[in-house]
Amino acid sequence: MGLTAHDRQLINSTWGKVCAKTIGKEALGRLLWTYPWTQRYFSSFGNLNSADAVFHNEAVAAHGEKVVTSIGEAIKHMDDIKGYYAQLSKYHSETLHVDPCNFKRFGGCLSISLARQFHEEYTPELHAAYEHLFDAIADALGKGYH
């Protein structure tokens, strides 16, 4: 299912409250700790051998912020998310060889981080809207693999 007008409205009305630095660090840290095989893409980040090391790693924090900032920019291009992510998709597929399933996994981790931030405001309806967005982004980033 694609993004509906209502999804877009919900996302646009809440994304401004997201702190890319905080949410990015938490979501990427959660991905790296929950799915340890994803750490192979981040060997330059140094020690990722414990939860404490992952969640206090400055490179994890910086990259998480970069990813969430990119999602904020993608929200401005919801009519053409595939176009927005075309070059990044190519880079992830041809240069980094990232397993495209990891994009979906990151979306799940990001959903958890958003739920922790928004609490009661993160209704099932808002959760669904963000899942639709993260699915569209995962699809766009995975496009280079097809």
Swiss-Prot record:
Family: Belongs to the globin family.
Quaternary structure, from the entry: Heterotetramer of two alpha chains and two beta chains.
GO molecular function, one term: metal ion binding
GO biological-process terms attached to the record: hydrogen peroxide catabolic process
Pfam families assigned to the protein according to its UniProt record, in alphabetical order: Globin
Function: Involved in oxygen transport from the lung to the various peripheral tissues.
Protein name, UniProt field: Hemoglobin subunit beta-1
InterPro entries, A to Z: Globin, Globin-like_sf, Globin/Proto, Hemoglobin_b, Hemoglobin_oxygen_transport
Binding-site residues for heme b, renumbered to this chain: H63, H92
Keyword NAD attached: no
Residue ranges of every copy of the Globin domain listed in the record: 2-146
